[in-house]
Amino acid sequence: MIKPLLIEIGVEELPAIPLLKELKNIEKKYADILEKNSLLCEFEFYYTPRRLVIWHREFKTQQDDSTEEFFGAPLEVAYKDGKATPAAEGFAKKCGVTMDAIGSAQKGGKEVLYYKKEVAGKPSIELIGDIVDTWIKSLDFGKSMRWGSLSESFIRPIRWVNILFGDESVDVELFGVKSAKKTFVHRISNFNSVSINGAKEYFEVLKAGGVTLFPELRRESILNNFSLLEKENGIKIECDEDLLDEVIAITEHPTAVLGSFDEEFLKLPPEVIITSMKEHQRYFPVFKDGKLINKFVVVSNALTDDFSK
């Protein structure tokens, strides 16, 4: 059987650069843990500054059955005068069986003691908690921090954990936070937690609450805003890809807004102005007729259409 599985780890705002540096490893680390638990299957990973999300459209309710092979001492060591030696008896004890169940197999050019154990798969719900715990603690964002009385550390404090296997909440405690059927939407939409009845409902709740969960949709929205601003104002926005990745990582509801600064600053070399805008304000420089002008574009995370103030 299969069910959808949603894993959401809610955090205080993640810094963009450490997140982007670890981004290439996040999915691989999770996949490796699934494979180790005989539960590897397709999944999608999403992120916003306030959440890390794993989504399985289909996740097995039971581990695959597996086999374990055990190899012991060569037969000439395992038996003496037709009787099992302490080496053979120790091997059987290690395998949890009597000598009657022990066979032999070729290994390294010798006939050695051999035992093959059939292992029944466990229910997935019993493993999900450890999988999530191992995955989160494997992530390396560089610097980390402690909070409260915890001895463990993470890049930012974890504020909620939401793990839904179908309509069932999976009991997990991560960094002192217990899982619950709730999430948080955009702060301007609702500062309080919002209940979630099932995994599939999650995406509808976020969308209604002003959160664009998918990074590729945030990118598309920003670029569409850029095109509109360029057409309306006869300008050209310099779209730096690294800066674009950063603003995608720090917004849940991005809107590009055109601003301006005092023309006096244009007396400075353009390189100085552009570097300052990009590195210190996360602004996108604006050009007209090939020249830098006293305008910039900032990507806002505000849930509003009124940027007049």
Task: For each feature predicted by the language model, list its residue ranges.
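Long, basic N-terminal domains or extensions that often function
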Residues: 1-282, 291, 302
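Switch/coupling subdomain of P-loop NTPase systems
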Residues: 308-309
